[in-house]
Amino acid sequence: MSRSSLVWGPFSVVWGLALALSTVLLRNCENKSDSAIFAFGVFMGGAYEYVCSAVGELLFGVIFWDYSGFKFNIAGRVNLLYCFFWGIAAVVWLRLGYPLVAKGMDLVRRHVKPWMTILLAIFMAVNMSLSGLALARYNSRTDGITPQNQLEVFLDEHFDNARMERVYPNAKKT
């Protein structure tokens, strides 16, 4: 099962943004109990997952995941079991993951970090933009709309249906 949400690399916008937001929101919680961090993660993770699902459907007309078959789900967008996973992830990230990443970043020379950050940000911005365009074109193509310009021809050649179905195997048009 693919958890990737971008056409280049095994990157997940949902998980990547969740880690970034968790880092910002939890950085002042180091002295809190694990149960408090867990509860925060359950609530915030569930809210975040619900919003991501709704935004994905609004922007792309696609449902990327559907939890309707789970007990205690809300509109199939989120369910209680996965909210618990978000809580566990919050504790693991704050206590183990982030400290390891911070130590690893300390090994990178100070003058290299800004350039690494800029290059990674540019790559991810291009990757997200291209992924959005490819997904929009895929939706048009499956509706029988032929390419209208060179960009759409490029997208059809490089991001054909088979590739898009590998990247987004669970996506369902609404």
Where do the PLM segments sit?
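Aromatic-rich, lipid-facing transmembrane alpha helices and their immediate juxtamembrane interface loops
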Residues: M1-T174
